[in-house]
């Protein structure tokens, strides 16, 4: 099957280079180009491409608005190009939430210096997302609304009595919050078979993680460690976004973090995250990987392998949507220790690569839709009445 691609960018140079790279592959054909979002919307309607590559910052109509328009009228897998800045990361996350399938950093120097790698990466991504069905009403739109968090106090108490009053107020607010959470999530009888939830994902992962984490209650009984293939500039912005949306606390993992129940730790981009110590006092170790032997930074395999030594079989591991097979070897090590491994089902994946790898290897025991994953996790860890 030949993948028909529409290339959208306000830079004529970048459009030419992307076209050259894609047409190096006989399975890809560029059928058109556009220099702004408005043209992209119109050409998606007339040309009916299999995949669209899209810049974010463009005149007339930006990439995010174009994604929204295309996904509501002529849905098509869209690969975004993004700058490696905090602002670029935020815009990219907005595009993914609007319905884009995946993104790549927009790095002109890589195209010039590492052409072979740039060619393979772009071609592989386009072919991978072209194989997945899309719908007019994207699953991204059904993410639960943001959960209001307790506002931070703007001033410090001035006397000991003020401090006591403030602390009592905080405790009362926390008790009320916990009561609301327990009521909405059902009664909790902690499943002692587990002490940690571990999630690994790649392409399509930002939306999948947001979908799951926004449904977990603030009194979630275990720490959560997450590995998402993502550049270094993106993981901070992504963790901050999730923290603002979720009842559980979400943070970008830092070296030395002690794992705490109800907190989700996102592996920082460009580095490797391992867990050391013992359950109850385990710490995160964030390390640079200069060996050149590991393709992914961060790597699901490395994180899961470290968990097999620290938490052994007391882990519920979940492999979500993503290209390749990262997570298969680490999941096997966890399963050998008695851990439980689940995979996202094919129908709800953006790319059925990583989940397929653990399923075909006989490592995962269940395949679950993205829509049902959070509820399945909560039932498994001990919430009743769901």
UniProtKB/Swiss-Prot annotation:
Top-level EC class: hydrolase
UniProt-annotated catalytic positions: 202, 229, 326
A GO BP annotation: chemotaxis
Protein modification: Phosphorylated by CheA. Phosphorylation of the N-terminal regulatory domain activates the methylesterase activity.
Entries under InterPro entries matching the protein: CheB-like (IPR008248), CheB_C (IPR035909), CheY-like_superfamily (IPR011006), Sig_transdc_resp-reg_Me-estase (IPR000673), Sig_transdc_resp-reg_receiver (IPR001789)
One Pfam family in the UniProt entry: CheB_methylest
Domain CheB-type methylesterase intervals: 190-384
Keyword match Iron: no
Catalyses which reaction(s): [protein]-L-glutamate 5-O-methyl ester + H2O = L-glutamyl-[protein] + methanol + H(+); L-glutaminyl-[protein] + H2O = L-glutamyl-[protein] + NH4(+)
CDD domains: CheB_Rec, REC_CheB-like
Positions of the Response regulatory domain: 4-121
Alphabetic keyword roster: Chemotaxis, Cytoplasm, Hydrolase, Phosphoprotein
EC number: 3.1.1.61, 3.5.1.44
Note on domains (UniProt): Contains a C-terminal catalytic domain, and an N-terminal region which modulates catalytic activity.
Function: Involved in chemotaxis. Part of a chemotaxis signal transduction system that modulates chemotaxis in response to various stimuli. Catalyzes the demethylation of specific methylglutamate residues introduced into the chemoreceptors (methyl-accepting chemotaxis proteins or MCP) by CheR. Also mediates the irreversible deamidation of specific glutamine residues to glutamic acid.
Protein family membership: Belongs to the CheB family.
NCBIfam families xrefs: PRK00742.1 (NF001965)
Designated name of the protein: Protein-glutamate methylesterase/protein-glutamine glutaminase
